[in-house]
Curated annotation (Swiss-Prot):
Family that this chain belongs to: Belongs to the SIMIBI class G3E GTPase family. UreG subfamily.
Source organism per UniProt: Acinetobacter baumannii (strain ATCC 17978 / DSM 105126 / CIP 53.77 / LMG 1025 / NCDC KC755 / 5377)
Protein task: Facilitates the functional incorporation of the urease nickel metallocenter. This process requires GTP hydrolysis, probably effectuated by UreG.
A UniProt-annotated Pfam family: cobW
Residues reported to bind GTP: 13-20
Gene Ontology, cellular component aspect: cytoplasm
GO terms, biological process: urea catabolic process
NCBIfam families with a match to the protein in the record: ureG
Source species taxonomy: Bacteria, Pseudomonadati, Pseudomonadota, Gammaproteobacteria, Moraxellales
Full protein name: Urease accessory protein UreG
Listed InterPro entries: CobW/HypB/UreG_nucleotide-bd, P-loop_NTPase, UreG
Subunit architecture: Homodimer. UreD, UreF and UreG form a complex that acts as a GTP-hydrolysis-dependent molecular chaperone, activating the urease apoprotein by helping to assemble the nickel containing metallocenter of UreC. The UreE protein probably delivers the nickel.
Keywords: Chaperone, Cytoplasm, GTP-binding, Nickel insertion, Nucleotide-binding
SUPFAM superfamilies given in the database record: P-loop containing nucleoside triphosphate hydrolases
Cell location: Cytoplasm
Length: 204
């Protein structure tokens, strides 16, 4: 691959939607295929980066946790400097990085990534939040490059109708893609990887 800036994939979504589980699965699936690293955002701790390290997502020096303080959406949108600095450090440390995953801190449906921080945005919501989540809209649901409706296994327990969520997601997103997933069983993971590779021009 010719030298170029790494593809930066932002993963956003509310607390508990499955962002870190998705990040872990992506790391395990792609770490031997691409020169990659991860930046995680937490408000006052580095819990997500520690989780990825404990679960051996990849070499610990390729996982950077930043503490955003205050509102986590500020660090991915209004003032992305702390994340941009972490990315610069990783690019200096690892020559020829091809892929950097930026996991946001848990936030509301209005949070979006700054275009200067993320080339591709994945937004994760979960079925446990209720079948009304897609129709509530917000930039994450309507404008993300890929909407991921996670934890499909919980639908019977919370009384969520996946058909309704499917119809609402289509209505809210128009032609933009979305998919259902279960990161516990890696259901949907291959489709997410294919999307990243296709959009990131890793594959023809």
């Amino acid at each position: 691959m010719t030298e170029r800036s790494p593809l930066r994939v932002g993963i956003g979504g509310p607390v508990g939607s499955g962002k870190t589980a998705l990040t872990l699965n992506l790391c395990r699936a792609l770490r031997d295929k691409y020169n990659m690293a991860v930046v995680t955002n937490d408000i006052y701790t580095k819990e997500d980066s520690n989780f990825l390290t404990r679960n051996e997502a990849m070499s610990p020096d390729r996982i950077v946790g930043v503490e955003t303080g205050g509102c986590p959406h500020t660090a991915i949108r209004e003032d992305a400097s702390i994340n941009l600095a972490a990315i610069d450090d990783l690019c200096e440390k690892f020559d020829g990085l091809e892929l950097i995953i930026i996991e946001s801190g848990g936030d509301n449906l209005a949070a979006t990534f700054s275009p200067e921080l993320s080339d591709l945005t994945l937004y994760v919501i979960d079925v446990a939040g209720g079948e009304k989540i897609p129709r509530k809209g917000g930039p994450g649901i309507t404008k993300s490059d890929l909407l991921i409706i996670n934890k499909t296994d919980l639908a019977p327990m919370v009384g969520a109708n996946l058909d309704v969520m499917d119809q609402d997601a289509k209505r809210m997103r128009g032609e933009k893609p979305f998919l259902f997933s279960n990161m516990k069983t890696q259901d949907g993971l291959e489709e997410i990887i294919q999307f990243i590779e296709k959009q990131g021009l890793f594959k023809a």
